[in-house]
């Protein structure tokens, strides 16, 4: 049986908390849930603007402490893949947000399926994006 390894983007984490059935199912089925450092960074920035910062931090910490969740570091190989994706998309005239480029680079590096609610990941042919709108 194949191991299901996903990379969760920020939009999917938020959708999961809101009970989005497709995202919830993708997370429940996954053997390994990966995060790029941009995801907790974006989430923490959002928490700081809200009224429930402490509670949201607690929920995120509990999620990240799961034995199925793995935080992937950005290294030289990730940077090379970022540059390749950036150059490719810029050449096509279809750029995506910078943090999502890092997420795509991480997915490409480790062969992970990106679970997201953002359609722009589908512009990156080097990755598999599972989009839940």
Question: Where do the model's predicted regions map?
Answer:
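Acidic, PIN/NYN-like endoribonuclease modules and their adjacent C-terminal/linker elements
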Residues: 1-4, 104, 108-133
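Short, well-structured N-terminal submotif of metal-dependent ribonuclease cores
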Residues: 1-39, 45-62
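Histidine- and aromatic-rich ligand-binding microenvironments
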Residues: 8-9, 36, 95-97, 118
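Generic structural signal for small/hydrophobic residues in well-ordered secondary structure
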Residues: 9-10, 43, 82, 107
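Alpha-helix capping/helix-boundary segments
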Residues: 12-13, 78, 102-103, 120-121
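Short, hinge-like loop/turn segments at secondary-structure boundaries
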Residues: 50-54, 89-90, 131-133
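Active-site neighborhoods of divalent-metal-dependent phosphate/nucleic-acid chemistry enzymes
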Residues: 70-115
């Amino acid at each position: 049986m194949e191991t299901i390894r996903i990379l969760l983007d920020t939009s999917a984490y938020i959708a999961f908390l809101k009970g989005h059935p497709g995202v919830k199912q993708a997370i429940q089925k996954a053997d390994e849930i990966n995060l790029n450092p941009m995801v907790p960074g974006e989430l923490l920035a959002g928490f700081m603007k809200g009224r429930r910062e402490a509670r949201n931090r607690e929920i995120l910490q509990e999620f990240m402490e799961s034995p199925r969740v793995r935080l992937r570091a950005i290294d030289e190989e990730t940077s090379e893949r970022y540059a390749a994706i950036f150059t490719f998309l810029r050449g096509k005239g279809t750029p995506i947000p910078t943090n999502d480029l890092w997420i795509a680079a991480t997915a490409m590096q480790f062969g992970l399926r990106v679970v997201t609610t953002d359609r722009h990941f589908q512009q990156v042919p080097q990755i598999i994006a599972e989009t839940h709108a």
